[in-house]
């Protein structure tokens, strides 16, 4: 995922936290904020030390980024997302984490249900 698709600055994270809608499941918490003037969606990732050691946290971040990259065509472009990984996300497969990401994005009404 290119750097222009990432939220990095602390004040940008804080802005999304303060003006957010959030949903969660056992593996992720997703905060979202609409930005109509934006040309593409942006994502901020947070994986705390509760998830595991540094290499495990990096592993989880890579899996989240890959899942979002695969879902990119289905995501609305005028959106900022913050994804916080919960400790249960450690030691899970890529396919499982992608399915959980789809689940939480459907709960947030970011992705459409198949039967709609």
Curated annotation (Swiss-Prot):
It catalyses: Endonucleolytic cleavage of RNA, removing 5'-extranucleotides from tRNA precursor. Disulfide bonds: none annotated. The keyword Hydrolase applies. InterPro entries: Ribosomal_Su5_D2-typ_SF (IPR020568), Ribsml_uS5_D2-typ_fold_subgr (IPR014721), RNase_P (IPR000100). One of its GO terms (biological process) is tRNA 5'-leader removal. The keyword RNA-binding applies. Keywords: Endonuclease, Hydrolase, Nuclease, RNA-binding, tRNA processing. GO terms for cellular component: ribonuclease P complex. Its EC number is 3.1.26.5. It comes from the Bacteria. One of its GO terms (molecular function) is 3'-tRNA processing endoribonuclease activity. Transmembrane segments: none annotated. RNaseP catalyzes the removal of the 5'-leader sequence from pre-tRNA to produce the mature 5'-terminus. It can also cleave other RNA substrates such as 4.5S RNA. The protein component plays an auxiliary but essential role in vivo by binding to the 5'-leader sequence and broadening the substrate specificity of the ribozyme. Belongs to the RnpA family. Consists of a catalytic RNA component (M1 or rnpB) and a protein subunit. This is Ribonuclease P protein component. It comes from Leuconostoc mesenteroides subsp. mesenteroides (strain ATCC 8293 / DSM 20343 / BCRC 11652 / CCM 1803 / JCM 6124 / NCDO 523 / NBRC 100496 / NCIMB 8023 / NCTC 12954 / NRRL B-1118 / 37Y).
């Amino acid at each position: 995922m290119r750097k222009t698709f990432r939220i990095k600055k602390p004040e940008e994270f804080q802005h999304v936290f303060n003006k957010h809608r959030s949903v969660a499941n056992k593996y992720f918490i997703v905060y979202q904020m609409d930005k109509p003037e934006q040309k593409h969606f942006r994502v901020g990732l947070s994986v705390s030390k509760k998830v595991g050691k540094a290499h495990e946290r990096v592993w989880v971040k890579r899996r989240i980024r890959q899942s979002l990259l695969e879902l990119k065509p289905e995501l609305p472009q005028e959106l900022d997302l913050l994804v916080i990984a919960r400790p249960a996300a450690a030691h899970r497969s890529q396919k499982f984490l992608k399915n959980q990401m789809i689940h939480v994005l459907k709960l947030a009404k970011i992705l459409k249900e198949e039967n709609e």
